[in-house]
Amino acid sequence: MKTTTEASWLKNSAFNFLVDYFASIPYRPYGTGATYENVVPFLKELQPGYVCVYAKGAPGYTTYPSSLKTQHLMLGQDMPKAFREFTRAADTKLVIYYSGLIDGIAGERHPDWRQWTIDGKPVGPSTGISNCIVNYSICPLSPYWEEWVSIQLREIIENYDPDGIWVDADWVGPCYCPRCQARLRADTGWKEPWADIKNRPDFQAEYAKSWNRITHGWRTQFNNFVKSLKPDCVYSAGNMSARREFAAPFDWRSGDFFTPHLFDLNDIARMMRWYGTMEAPYDAYVCDTNFAMTRPEVRSRTKTLDRILQQAAVVAANGGAVGYWTFPFGNGALVPSRMRKAIATRKFIQAREDLFIGSSSAAWTAILISDPACGVFGGPAGEGAHKALAGLHRSPDIIDETGVTDAMPYDLLVLPEQAFLDPQTAARLEKYVRAGGLLLSAGASLNSPELRKMLGVKNVRFGDLADGHVLLKTSDEPTGVDSLWDRVELEGDAEELYPLYLSWDQFNTEVLRNLHNNYPLHGQVDEEHPEPAGCPAAITRKLGKGRIVHLCTGIFSRYRSLGDPQMLGWLREVLDMLQPRTRCRTDAPSWVDLSLRRAADGRLLAHFVNHNPGRGMVKPIFYSLKNGRVEHQQVKWRQ
């Protein structure tokens, strides 16, 4: 059976529309305001590729009468039925939102379906942003599929004939229940007691891989069932791993990367660039509301149009379709002021569609995520590498090991600290470098014996120093990285590129015991008389026609959390040395993102997008603004 569907309307859709209307408040009528007169005129003006509406949200209440008796307690109308009528009247597609592995009602009725913690206890309920919302994370290996999800999916598809299904909440977990423990044992052959297994040094990495396989099986089962009921119904699950080994079920890639709560604009750009290597259509929902999940004292308010357009530009500049994500009025009616912003966003995208529909990456720099245990978003090292390379205007693609081929077009590959690099990929990397390619690696990537051999590293003592400094060649300001540094011993024609220097008073035990890391007089290098650490901070080796540079610390993971301009300065100097002539160079500030792409007609496009976050009042991390002033976010498009 064919498990994916080619849908031209997905590829040609530049703008989609999500109505975020949880059926979660049991003492308020649900859906009475979503009338033909309120909804259809807006849909006709917006002309979205599809409209996504809820059938079931995380609390488990359905927006239609289900045989499982899960419908909203004050359901005003059958919402999928209403929106099936509305979308047909507006000549657009209907996509159904369905909460996958979070279901409050299922967890209440079937406690044995709930996920377990690593300590062997069922995961408790989460109340989210309301005392009346109860969510439970559900184990994908439980009877939840057979006795719950498959029943509701059949109801949805047979009764409402949707054009697509968008699944949320498959990102929860991992689950450590006996079912999932048994799967881990089957995958690894481990036979020790659970108490011993979870203390193994390789437990976290192996469990991550096993859990990825479990959830991949869940998504495959989900999509196969959808296709068995309606072969042309497209499927996606939001915010899932973009590794190719898990790509098969997806008809399109998608995510709800809402800012400023969990995601920055850089995060949206990163996932669009990763999705862009997957040969499937992709979109991202940008929310018109400051969704204050982490700060219950802050009232959610509508964003300015400038901010919404800025987010939309990040998606569009990287080849994605823009999903406008709106919250309706409490009774389900679309809010006129928000719809005016939606229409303005639609016009903004429509005026530029030829610049990104059918476009592709210029493919000149790529970040390689080779560790199969990495997180959904690339892990700290992958995320930090993108943050740094985007700040240096490298417009990086993100690939996994399957993207390392003889035909890959990249001038430069960056291997951020990766705990695992398989020998076959390492061999392809060596072939790439010998043919003239450039490779920058860092930190734990030296776990690979093949990479050590390529670099000419004879011995390595991992994590030998907890702090270190580099004196730059083009700046009088040193770069300090308070992360573990590896002490490497070189052989052959490998060269030290930068020596490592110690912090002043680095081994004073009383200082280490009493001073917090943020104390201003802590972790300084003596710039006039720096103390050598006796080992390199960075090494290099020419290999065939190409060159490898390795940074002996986990700089990308550290840059992800800190974003130090000194770290970025060192990375800029290293890249300028490694690649003195590059395809594109700009003196734009680091917060101006460059996306270098090819239009469908072959034109080379350089999109410049302002990534300045503005004043994100609901973000747990506050931003420093120049002169304390919020400036309008503008996007500039250049051919």
Q: Where is each model-derived feature located?
A:
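Carbohydrate-binding surfaces of carbohydrate-active enzymes
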Residues: 2-6, 11-13, 42, 83-86, ...
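Short acidic, glycine/proline-enriched helix-loop-strand junctions
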Residues: 6, 62-85, 90-92, 173-193, ...
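Aromatic-lined carbohydrate-binding/catalytic grooves of carbohydrate-active enzymes
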Residues: 39-40, 44-81, 102-127, 131, ...
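Proline-aspartate-enriched helix->loop->beta-strand connector
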Residues: 48, 161-165, 170, 231
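Active-site-adjacent "subsite" loops/lids of carbohydrate-active enzymes
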Residues: 96-160, 169, 192-208, 217-221
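N-terminal structural segment of carbohydrate-active enzymes
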Residues: 2-61, 90-92
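Stable alpha-helical elements in mature extracytoplasmic
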Residues: 35-39, 76-83, 145, 149-152, ...
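Active-site mouth loops of central-metabolism enzymes
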Residues: 21-35, 134-148, 295-305
